[in-house]
Curated annotation (Swiss-Prot):
Keyword Glycoprotein carried by entry: no
Subcellular location: Cytoplasm
Described purpose of this protein according to its UniProt entry: Catalyzes the reduction of the glycolytic intermediate dihydroxyacetone phosphate (DHAP) to sn-glycerol 3-phosphate (G3P), the key precursor for phospholipid synthesis.
PANTHER family to which the protein is assigned, alphabetical: GLYCEROL-3-PHOSPHATE DEHYDROGENASE (PTHR11728), GLYCEROL-3-PHOSPHATE DEHYDROGENASE [NAD(+)] 2, CHLOROPLASTIC (PTHR11728:SF1)
PROSITE patterns per record: NAD_G3PDH
Residues reported in the UniProt entry to bind NADPH: S13, Y14, K108, A141, R257, I281, E283
Gene name of the record: gpsA
Identification of the protein by name: Glycerol-3-phosphate dehydrogenase [NAD(P)+]
Main location: cytoplasm
Binding site for sn-glycerol 3-phosphate: K108, G137, T139, K193, D246, S256, R257, N258
SUPFAM superfamilies: 6-phosphogluconate dehydrogenase C-terminal domain-like, NAD(P)-binding Rossmann-fold domains
Active site as annotated: K193
Length: 340
């Protein structure tokens, strides 16, 4: 078998889908999961019965239980784990990295407890010499895994790395890869859209209709853009795949856990029961606190995020939160050519 082109760390639905997509493109891929029993089941059944039971693994996708073997087998390490364990995963893989290693992640989140960008976390743990990149964009795991047409964006710490990843993983038949040099913007778009999607779900669960949903999406995009610009991101990034594209997808399609979680809250279900019914990690719930923390630290107003935070963490009712948003002081939509 050919040399390993990519090791994927994280055998959940999204990590598995990415591994399948890369393998389908002719690359030898290793897929590592933290649970040895789960990895053994992947090896036996040649599919991920827990998350993607109907999608068989290509022959060149190899589940791997040894973290050392997985990391040392390839220079390209793609991390696809929930954001709250991203920090620990980097610490775990760091001893096995070498001067040729390169780190990519598809995790959409901020560091738990600090609100830091994952780029900052990676630099702190891994140092300045290892190239870093992000895969982000409007993708649902199942559609990616079964080979439906999908587009994604890569942002990297240097142009050469970005170009190589684009060429490595682009597939004319189903998987289109765009480049974007704006690492900050690409990260923020992928994080905050999950928070806004909870709000869109709450609105739909309350029966507010399509008008309210699109208002939340539009003003949510304004919040993402405000914070991004304040942190040095490019406005154009938020008009692209990792901004507007990912936001619209996550706010409007019921494959989104964040949207479904919000719908349940809007229908009156409590948070614990809604989490249980979703059955998988809801990144927007985990990251609302961190996004609010980051916005307050930077000094950026994010009223939708603020109200979602109070619903999730302060016991505010969804009705009260909606009334608070609707009764805010009237203002201009456009300021300095930006939708603020």
């Amino acid at each position: 078998m050919n040399a390993v082109s990519m090791t994927v760390i994280g055998a959940g639905s999204y990590g598995t889908a990415l591994a399948i997509a890369f393998a389908r493109n002719g690359h030898h891929v290793l897929l590592w999961g933290y649970n040895p029993q789960h990895v053994r089941e992947l090896q036996i059944h040649r599919c991920n019965q827990a998350f993607l039971p109907d999608v068989q693994f290509p022959d060149n996708l190899s589940p791997e239980a040894s973290l050392e073997t997985a990391i040392t087998a390839s220079r390209n390490i793609l991390i696809a784990v929930p954001s709250h364990v991203f920090h620990q995963v980097l610490y775990n893989i760091q001893p096995y990295l070498n001067q040729h290693s390169r780190i990519i992640w598809a995790t959409k989140g901020l560091e738990h407890g600090t609100g830091r960008l994952l780029q900052e976390v990676a630099r702190e743990i891994l140092g300045d010499k290892i190239p870093l990149a992000i895969f982000s964009g409007p993708t649902f795991a199942k559609e990616l895994a079964i080979g439906l047409p999908t587009a994604i964006t890569v942002a990297a710490s240097n142009a050469e790395f970005s170009e190589e990843l684009q060429q490595l993983f682009h597939c004319d038949k189903s998987f289109r890869v765009y480049k974007n040099p704006d690492m900050i913007g690409v990260q923020l778009g992928g994080v905050i859209k999950n928070v806004i999607a909870i709000g869109a779900g709450i609105s739909d669960g309350m029966g507010f209709g399509a008008n309210a949903r699109i208002a939340l999406i539009t003003r949510g995009l304004a919040e993402i853009s405000r914070l991004g610009i304040a942190m040095g991101a490019e406005l154009s990034t938020f008009m692209g795949m990792t901004g507007l594209g990912d936001l619209v997808l996550t706010c409007t399609d019921n494959q989104s856990r964040n949207r479904r979680f919000g719908i349940l809250l809007g229908q009156g279900m409590d948070i614990e029961e809604a989490e249980k019914q979703i059955g998988q990690i809801v990144e927007g719930y985990l990251n609302t606190k961190e996004v609010r923390m980051l916005a307050r630290r930077i000094g950026v107003e994010m009223p939708i995020t603020e109200q979602i935070y109070h619903v999730l963490y302060s016991g505010k009712s969804v009705v009260e939160a909606a009334n608070t948003l609707l009764s805010r002081t009237l203002k201009d939509e456009i300021h300095d050519k930006v939708c603020f």
